[in-house]
UniProtKB/Swiss-Prot annotation:
Pfam families: AMP-binding, Condensation, Methyltransf_12, PP-binding, TubC_N
Region (Thioesterase) residue spans: 1584-1797
Keywords of this entry: Ligase, Phosphopantetheine, Phosphoprotein
Modified residues (O-(pantetheine 4'-phosphoryl)serine): 1442
InterPro entries hit by this protein: AA_adenyl_dom, AB_hydrolase_fold, ACP-like_sf, AMP-bd_C_sf, AMP-binding, AMP-binding_CS, AMP-dep_synth/lig_dom, ANL_N_sf
Cofactors that this protein relies on: pantetheine 4'-phosphate
Organism phylogeny: Bacteria, Pseudomonadati, Pseudomonadota, Gammaproteobacteria, Pseudomonadales
KW Phosphoprotein (keyword) present: yes
This protein's encoding gene: pchF
Protein name stated in the entry: Pyochelin synthetase PchF
Summary of the function given for this chain in its UniProt record: Involved in the biosynthesis of the siderophore pyochelin. Adenylates L-cysteine and loads it onto its peptidyl carrier domain via a thioester linkage to the phosphopanthetheine moiety. Then forms a peptide bond between the salicyl-thiazolinyl intermediate bound to the second carrier domain of PchE and the cysteine bound to its own peptidyl carrier domain to form the salicyl-thiazolinyl-cysteinyl-S-PCP2 intermediate. It subsequently cyclizes the C-terminal cysteine to form the second thiazoline heterocycle in the salicyl-thiazolinyl-thiazolinyl-S-PCP2 intermediate.
Pathway, per record: Siderophore biosynthesis
GO terms for MF: ligase activity; phosphopantetheine binding
Positions of the Carrier domain: 1407-1488
């Protein structure tokens, strides 16, 4: 007996132990301490003393009885769990129970008894303060008992009353800071009396409740009974527990638990709904009972096996959870009654003594229930021997090590077996409740068992909204059924798993026990001259193939081929492959296909098998094989007919060996027998009616088992096989040609190849081809969009999904694909083929329950013989089931659906846990593919164990419809850029002369340096090697020397003769000094500043010293680190300024075309920021007006990056990063498909291979991207004698042509070749800039691609999967990589994902920006006990957890005045969403108390003093629930006002008083502008509706009225839909003048007018025409382009031409001054524009309820026939009744008293249903 068991025995016998002065003391009831136990106590005396003295002793502190004391860890968890900010939170830890009392119960007497207990028990007077402390009130008033007098009700009415009380109390969440917390009620009927107890377990636990009920009954029955005063208190107990945490025992227990921590499993992986409701707060109670006889029988059987009855109940629960858990190892959360014998009276004290203990369970261990129960019991007692380090402590450590979410252990076991009755002793025992339900925060399932009422009471409380329909009931029934079996049957304890009845083993199809080639042979004899196969060379009959195969057979037999031998085949895709395999099989041997593209070492590994006696290949491919090689193309066909019969083989003989990739890196050879494969071939031919009329396209390689069907299944049926040309085997256009040429009827491929064909055909919409009648897809996931796309092309094709494994005869399972399957997350896997079995089994070989994931096992006649030469691997994968069947473990995961079919869930590798959540990658891929622009999606897992994350990749469709002509936009941008080039350049002749003088000066310096070689003095040519030797030219500079020689030759200094050079006799005689003086004299200073001229001269005159290394080229250009020369070269010249301004204007023109779009710019080689300055300055006003720009400034040099960070520090939208254009472009932190504008000034020429660079950059470009490039476009001798000495040698055509630069034409050719759909130069030919040799190049790329922002796609996916499933990386690719077999290459994707996404921000840890950040940082460091944290440190990343963040919030509210203005729960939500000091500071700053301008003040509140960016108007005493605002208190069904386009409740001000009389009035307002704007407009209303419904549901509302005005009506509609899905009744949905705009608004003038009108500004004073005139202009423009109001549609109206000035007037008027409240004003305008864009989304989806539409009688001047338009839209949206009501006023002023009166009239009851 362990020490823990000894203590438990003493507790069970009510023996109290304590230490006193080093001696062991005890107190025991008579007869409880027998001789054996006394001896045991003496033997364990020292251990007991050590245990009892390990913690601090009892310390009574009566003087502090009414002072605050801390919560226990469990209490703190309960309090924190009440916050709805946490998943599975938002509810109390509460029990509601109903007890029968006598019908004649005296309420006054019962009330007196209750108050007597309140006086005796301090915790009945306790409250919780500040969510962190508890306090016992010294005095409380007399507590009145709520009594419902129902004696006048009949039985039915009384039961209805009880139901109403139950509905009100069974999920009550009592206010813990207000006494009384416990408020029992009494219902007295005619014949019944029911006591209602809603008990918050934060103050008293279940055992305390039983003590309370027992004492209450005793006091009621005997009012004179006097209980002994309680000296012990719960407060004193908590003090002991607090001090215990400083004891050696706590440290010892902590060490024990932490040593086990990394090995602890996570929570049970129970199947959940596709979208579990993490905000659900409702529970359902299940109850069952073992009668006393059954319970005694179970206890007796437990005793026979040395187990306790309580331990058996726990083991049975673990067994049940293990049956349903998709991971066999998991932790259960045990609640433990922690009442140590610290004080004799502690057993009578009320309080929450609950402790938690995590019990690790592995359901795989143990061959019988007894063994597993013993193991669990031993583990539990070991755990309970280390109790001082609590389960809450352990959960916090789990969260620290594994991340947020790991601390969720939501499956709880609570046992009161024996313990409750022992605690009650001989006192009054309460009766069993007539009804009971409990709920606990962050708990999914709570199992409670107790024997206190005789028999065993079994209860489960299950959170609703998590588990699939019927699952909780099935799990509960399993648990109860197991307990009943254990009580009834001895075999249930000792037998292994009881297997379910097994159907008769699958039987092979008749006629399948033969060679796989027998069907071909029969067909050859039957129709010898029928065509059997087509390849690139021609067509062949059965006779031809058979005769060639016969010839091959003879040769192979001569080399020893026969039964038991193998012959390898390495041939390209052709008819020769069919000849080879038929010949090999006729010889009785097995064939081994080897892909001709495989690496030599892999081929050698296959060849190493001693059974391989020969190879068949082409003469040109004969390998050095070490065995006989037969060149099939040198064999002549046999002429004999019929050919000799095939060698006799047994059905179980080997037919072929296919090698697949092995997990160890060594290929594994799968050996299939003839009988196994023949059964599949026969089933497929019969199933799909394959006959001689069919043509199958043989896409599969011979080494892929789909080819087995093509060659042996199709040919046996007489069908023809069509093979693609091996040179075009992966070309879908070639497949299309074959479909047309051969009228293919049977398509057999992996899904990716079907996808490739459809992708190609969709790009050729005019091409019409005959389609296959039957399509077989297998080998990989089938994208759910593929069937629909296929049917769109060929609606008559029958589509089938086939599955299985190479180890099981090609296929084992089939699913006909139906249209409804395309709406699922994945195509179902289906049912087994004939002769085979496919089962989903758990780790113990049991059939998984429906919905539970397990491993797919294949059985039946199709199983392989095993793996060639690998008995160990064969034994691992081919296993014996307990019932004796042989099964193949596929490693694939699946689950049974309700109809018994199987759903495929991917490989085990496709399952991952992220922060404790089980994720199926297929579900995420399906959600991504559901987006209409996504073509394919694939997700991979990154990282190990607790650091795992997801990376998703998608490819996109082409745009659904063509936009504007790309040439038009390109020409517009070019014209804007060209205008920026206009300058007073002076005389073009003078510029040309200066350029020529500069060239002469450079050449003169070169010639003078070259003279040192003796070249000009030599009479014979000097070869290149001699020149290099004489001049001392290193190899790295020899290319530059060749360039110089060419330039000197063109300049008349020398001429080439043969392999050498000679000086020209009549070469220019000008000296370098004279030449440079001449240039300086004619060079315009505006183009060549004096400092630049001096630098060029100095560099040209010191070539020898630079080449010798005596002078550094870099030091010349950057003297003493100064950039002044670089500034003179790149920035100061007139040409540099013009070029950079042209680039800036071009980029501005591009951005201004779509100012609402987010623009991502990447500048390469930014260097001195010469171009950057112009571009950033030009973009800054656009950013200020609301355009979102992300500008990434890059260079290879940290020198330039540091300077740029300082220069642009005031532009937060500019980021910085290192980028090496000559490195791997995908390895530098810029994601593919993420750049909208790529700009570069003079840098791309520095690339080693410019065409390759442009090709790589294309991968980074998004759809419809732009290149804006400035480059040198002629040879510049001044560069060749200066900067070229710092440049590397190019490897493109510049090297071949001895050039440093290329002309504009070559640049345009490169751009066109590398994805520039359209490209042009800006500089006019013959202009000054052209003479100087410069151009600005524009290219527009990927105009044929759809555009999709990853953020937009993430928002789309967020509506379909839980947040924990969202990928950490999301990248858009041109195409997904595929393997040789056409499957998605996930290994390659993992490599892509591991390419770094560099942190390209400012990079330096920043100090606190103000006092608020400093204060928050101090709190972060204090709570986390880490002084090194920074302002951007994530709280949870630094080791924080949910309990610590609650402490942080409590301290925050204590210390910061700005935080005390906000309720605890709001601060907690903010901290969870922005868990950094800087992020939380920003949230606090963005909720100011006062506004800044009159218009904005009105927008944000009822009066200017109540404004704030993140808060809607608050009436006096109103409470903000973020985004929910309580405006007016009241009783009854609340009315909820939904904000309009400003995100505010401004328009409702006239209605507040009228609507708020007598009933609650709530509002929904935008609380986080950034979050609102981050939601893509097309999903905004639906996303808001979902979030607002969550807020209303989380606030406990179950019935509401909704009111939405303007765009708020659209949001209200979506909110109503989501509320209905959550079970909340929408009694009235009222829509006021809400209009979905049926066209796109591109003219900002209309937005500005609507914004001003909504704010109530004087639109005429702002310069707008009359609204009617504006409306007429809108309609006139729409008559021309109905789908779009063009960007300049209203520009011709008076006063509206200057959009910039108009915008300035409106925004100034909105803020009340030119600069006040500009940030708030601009944000408000952005909110409004975003809301308008959301109102332009697709047509309204139907709403299944009724609604009322209120139409202003004066209409909307911007919309003709407004009433009719509104009625049409909303009648179509409402499937229920749609009442139309006219109200006075126009759209902008209809919210008045008349509307309030109309709204007050209730909707007819029949319409509201």
């Amino acid at each position: 007996m362990s020490l823990g068991e000894l203590l438990e025995t003493c507790r069970s016998r009510r023996i109290e132990l304590w230490s006193e002065a080093g001696r062991l003391r005890y107190r025991a009831p008579q007869g409880a301490l027998d001789a054996g136990l006394a001896e045991r106590l003496r033997a364990e005396r020292e251990a007991l003393l050590e245990h009892l003295e390990g913690g601090p002793g009892w310390r009574a502190e009566p003087d502090l009885a009414h002072q605050r004391f801390p919560l226990t860890p469990v209490q703190a968890a309960y309090v924190l769990g009440r916050q709805a900010a946490f998943d599975y939170g938002g509810n109390a830890c509460q029990l509601y129970a109903e007890y029968d009392w006598p019908a004649d119960t005296d309420p006054a007497r019962l009330e007196a008894a209750w108050n007597a207990m309140v006086e005796r028990h301090p915790m009945l007077r306790a409250v919780i303060e500040d969510n962190a402390w508890q306090r016992v009130l010294p005095e409380v008033p007399w507590q009145r008992l709520t009594v419902h007098a129902c004696a006048g009700l009949d039985e039915a009415a009384f039961q209805a009353h009880l139901e109403r009380v139950r509905e009100r109390l069974d999920h009550a969440c009592a206010a813990l800071d207000q006494w009384p917390v416990l408020r029992p009620e009494l219902s007295i009927g005619r014949d019944d009396c029911v006591l209602h107890c809603s008990v918050d377990f934060t103050l008293v636990d279940y055992a305390s409740l039983q003590l309370l009920l027992g004492e209450w009954r005793r006091r009621y029955l005997d009012p004179q009974w006097t209980a002994e005063p309680l000296e012990a208190t719960f407060r004193d107990y908590v003090g002991v527990e607090q001090r215990r945490r400083q004891s050696p025992a706590w440290q010892r227990d902590r060490d024990w638990w932490l040593a086990r921590l990394d090995a602890l499993p996570g929570r049970p992986d129970l199947p959940l709904r596709a979208q579990p409701d993490t905000r659900s707060t409702r529970f359902r109670h299940f109850h069952a009972r073992l009668d006393e006889a059954a319970w005694q029988a179970l206890g007796a059987r437990a005793g026979e096996h040395g187990l306790s009855a309580a331990g058996v109940a726990l083991a049975a629960f673990a067994e049940t959870i293990g049956r349903w858990s998709q991971a066999p190892a998991f932790c259960l959360n045990l609640t433990v009654l922690n009442r140590p014998p610290l004080h004799p009276q502690l057993a009578q004290v009320l309080g929450d003594f609950t402790a938690l203990s995590l019990l690790a369970v592995d359901s795989r261990h143990g061959d019988s229930f007894v063994e597993r129960a013993r193991r669990i019991g031993e583990q539990m007692f070991d755990d309970l021997d280390h109790p001082t380090f609590s389960g809450v402590d352990l959960l916090r450590e789990l969260a620290r090590r594994r991340g947020r979410g790991a601390d969720l252990m939501p499956v709880v076991f609570t046992s009161g077996i024996g313990s409750v009755q022992r605690l009650l002793g001989d006192g009054e025992a309460p009766r069993a409740p007539r009804y009971m339900i409990s709920q606990t925060p962050q708990v999914w399932l709570d199992c409670q068992v107790t024997d206190q009422f005789g028999g065993l009471e079994i209860g489960w409380d299950v959170r609703l909204g998590l588990f699939p329909e019927g699952q909780a009931e099935a799990m509960f029934d399993d648990f109860v059924g197991l307990l009943r079996r254990l009580a009834q049957s001895p075999r249930a304890w000792t037998d292994g798993d009881a297997t379910e009845p097994v159907e008769a083993p699958p039987q092979a199809l008749p006629g399948s026990a033969r060679s796989i080639a027998a069907g071909f042979a029969e067909r050859a004899l039957l129709t010898p001259d029928a065509t059997v196969i087509h390849d690139a060379a021609g067509s062949y009959s059965y006779r031809q193939v058979a005769q060639h195969a016969s010839a091959l057979r003879r040769v192979l037999e001569a080399h020893g081929a026969g039964r038991g031998r193998r012959v390898a085949v390495m041939l390209p895709k052709s008819a020769a492959q069919l000849v080879a395999v038929i010949g090999i099989l006729q010889a009785g041997a097995a064939y081994v296909p080897v892909d001709i593209r495989q690496p030599p070492l892999r081929r050698q590994a296959i060849l190493a098998s001693p059974e391989v006696v020969a190879w068949v290949c082409l003469e040109s491919d004969v390998p050095n094989a070490g065995c006989a090689c037969v060149a099939i193309d040198r064999l002549a066909a046999d002429s004999a007919w019929p050919p000799p019969p095939a060698a006799e083989v047994a059905a179980d003989d080997l037919a072929y060996v296919i090698y697949t990739s092995g997990s160890t890196g060594t290929p594994k050879g799968v050996m299939l027998s003839h009988a196994a494969v023949s059964n599949t071939l026969l089933d497929i031919n019969q199933r799909y009616g394959v006959d001689a009329n069919d043509r199958v396209l043989g896409l599969a390689e011979l080494s892929f088992d789909l080819s087995v069907y093509d060659f042996f299944g199709a040919t046996a049926a007489g069908a023809q096989v069509v093979l693609p040309d091996p040179a075009r085997g992966s070309d879908p256009s070639h497949w299309a040609e074959l479909l047309e040429r051969h009228a293919i009827t049977l398509w057999n491929s992996v899904p990716a190849q079907g996808q490739m064909l459809i992708d190609y055909l969709e790009s050729e919409p005019q091409r019409h081809l005959p389609g296959p009648r039957c399509v077989l897809w297998s080998g990989d996931w089938i994208p759910v969009s593929l069937p629909t796309r296929w049917w769109r092309r060929w609606p008559d094709s029958a589509l089938f999904s086939l599955g299985g494994a190479t180890e099981a005869a090609i296929w084992s399972i089939e699913q006909p694909i139906r249209p409804q399957h395309t709406e699922l997350a994945s195509i179902p896997y289906g049912r087994a083929l004939r002769g085979q079995s496919v089962e989903v089994l758990d780790a113990r070989g049991r059939r998984c329950p429906p919905g539970v994931r397990g491993e797919i096992h294949i059985g039946g006649v199709g199983l392989a013989l095993g793996y060639a030469g690998d008995p160990q691997r064969t034994a691992e994968r081919f296993v014996r089931h307990p019932d004796g069947r042989r099964l193949y473990r596929t490693g694939d995961l699946g689950r049974y659906l309700a109809d018994g079919s199987i759903e495929f869930l991917g490989r085990e590798d496709d399952q991952v846990k992220i922060r404790g959540h089980r994720i199926e990658l297929a579900e995420l891929d399906a959600a991504l593919c559901a987006h209409p622009q996504v073509n394919l999606a694939a997700t991979v897992v990154l990282g190990e164990t607790h650091e795992r994350s997801l990376a998703s990749f998608v490819t996109l469709h082409a745009p659904a419809e063509a936009g504007e002509d790309p040439r038009t936009a390109l020409d517009t941008v070019r014209q804007r850029a060209a205008q920026a080039l206009r300058r007073d350049w002076g005389s073009e002749e003078g510029i040309a002369a200066a350029v020529a003088a500069l060239d002469r000066a450079c050449l003169a310096s070169l010639a003078a340096w070259l003279a040192g070689s003796g070249l000009f003095a030599s009479a014979t040519p000097l070869d290149f090697a001699t020149l290099c030797q004489r001049l001392g030219i290193a190899e790295a500079r020899q290319r530059l020397l060749r360039h110089w020689l060419r330039q000197l030759e063109e300049g008349g200094y020398l001429r080439a003769e043969g392999e050498g050079w000679l000086g020209c006799a009549e070469r220019p005689a000008q000296s370098p000094e004279d030449a440079w003086t001449a240039f300086a004299g004619c060079a315009p200073a505006a183009l060549w500043p004096a400092e630049l001229v001096a630098y060029l001269r100095d560099s040209a005159q010191s070539l020898g010293e630079q080449l010798a290394g005596r002078i550094s080229p870099a030091a010349l250009m950057f003297p003493q680190g100064s950039a002044r020369i670089a500034e003179a070269m790149y920035s100061q010249g007139l040409h540099a300024q013009a070029l950079h301004e042209a680039m800036a204007e071009a980029i501005a023109a591009i951005v201004e075309r779509q100012p609402q779009r987010r623009w991502r710019l990447l500048e390469l080689g930014a260097g001195t920021a010469a171009a950057s300055r112009a571009v950033i300055a030009r973009l800054a006003p656009l950013v200020q007006r609301g355009t979102e720009v992300d500008y990434l400034f890059t260079d290879v040099s940290s020198y330039f990056l540091a300077a740029a960070r300082e220069r642009f520090a005031d532009q937060p939208w500019v980021r910085f990063g290192r980028f090496d254009m000559n490195g791997d472009l995908l390895d530098q932190g810029v994601a593919p498909h993420s750049v909208d504008i790529l700009l570069s000034s003079g840098a791309l020429n520095n690339a080693l291979d410019t065409p390759a660079l442009l090709a790589g950059l294309r991968e980074l470009l998004s759809a419809d991207a732009w290149l804006v490039i400035q480059e040198l476009t002629r040879e510049h001798n001044e560069i060749s004698v200066s900067q070229s000495l710092m440049m590397e040698n190019p490897r493109d055509l510049r090297d071949e042509r001895r050039q440093l630069f290329v002309h504009t034409g070559q640049w345009l050719e490169w751009l066109a070749a590398q994805g520039g759909d359209l490209a042009c130069g800006v500089v006019p030919p013959g202009s000054a800039l052209d003479l100087l040799g410069y151009d600005v190049l524009l290219a527009r790329c990927k105009t044929d691609r759809a555009r999709l922002e990853p953020a937009e796609l993430l928002a789309f996916v967020e509506a379909r999967v839980p947040r924990y499933m969202l990928p950490a990386q999301l990248r858009v690719l041109e195409r997904l990589p595929v393997t040789g077999n056409g499957k998605i290459d996930r290994k390659a994707l993992t490599g892509f994902a591991r390419q770094p996404q560099a942190d390209l921000r400012h990079g330096v840890a920043q100090a606190p920006a103000d006092e608020l950040e400093s204060a928050l940082l101090a709190l972060w460091r204090e709570v986390l006990d880490n002084p090194s944290l920074g302002v951007e440190q994530d709280f949870f990343g630094a080791g924080g957890d949910s309990l610590l963040i609650a402490q942080l919030i409590a301290r925050l509210r204590e210390r910061l005045e700005s935080a005390r203005r906000h309720p605890f729960d709001r601060l907690l939500r903010w901290a969870l969403s922005q868990p950094t000091p800087r992020g939380l500071a920003e949230r606090l700053r963005s909720a100011p108390e006062e506004g800044r301008g009159p218009a904005l003040a009105a927008a944000r509140g009822v009066a200017p003093a109540q404004t704030g960016m993140s808060r809607a108007p608050l009436a006096e005493g109103a409470v903000a629930l973020d985004p929910l605002v309580r405006l007016v208190p009241g009783e009854g069904v609340p009315r909820v006002l939904v904000h309009e386009g400003l995100g505010t409740l401004l328009p409702y001000r006239p209605l507040l008083r009228a609507l708020g009389e007598g009933r609650p009035l709530l509002g929904l307002a935008v609380h986080d502008s950034d979050a609102y704007l981050a939601i893509p407009a097309e999903y905004l209303n639906a996303c808001l509706g979902r979030r607002y419904a969550e807020a209303l549901h989380g606030a406990g509302l179950r019935e509401v009225d909704l009111l939405g005005y303007c765009s708020g009506g659209l949001v209200a509609l979506e909110t109503a839909k989501s509320l209905l899905q959550r079970g909340v009744r929408v009694r009235q949905l009222d829509i006021v003048s809400s209009y979905r705009i049926p066209y796109r608004v591109d003219d900002e003038r209309l937005l500005l007018f609507s914004f001003a009108a909504t704010l109530g500004l004087d639109t005429a004073a702002l310069g707008f025409p009359a609204p009617e005139r504006l409306g007429q202009a809108v309609q006139a423009a729409l008559a021309q382009t109905p789908e779009r109001l063009g960007a300049e549609a209203l520009a011709g109206l008076p006063g509206l031409a200057d959009l910039v000035a108009l915008r300035g007037r409106v925004l100034q008027a909105a803020s009340g001054s030119a600069d006040a409240a500009s940030v708030e004003r601009d944000t408000l305008y952005r909110l409004f524009c975003h809301s308008v864009r959301a109102s332009q989304a697709e047509a309204l989806e139907p709403y299944v309820g009724a609604l009322r539409l209120f139409v202003p009688d004066a209409g909307n001047p911007l919309v003709p026939r407004y009433a009719e338009a509104l009625e049409t839209q909303w009648r179509a949206a409402a499937l229920g009744a749609c009442g139309i009501h006219e109200v006075p006023g126009g759209h902008f002023d209809c919210l008045g008293e008349a509307l309030a009166q109309s709204l007050s009239k209730p909707m007819p009851e029949e319409a509201s249903q």
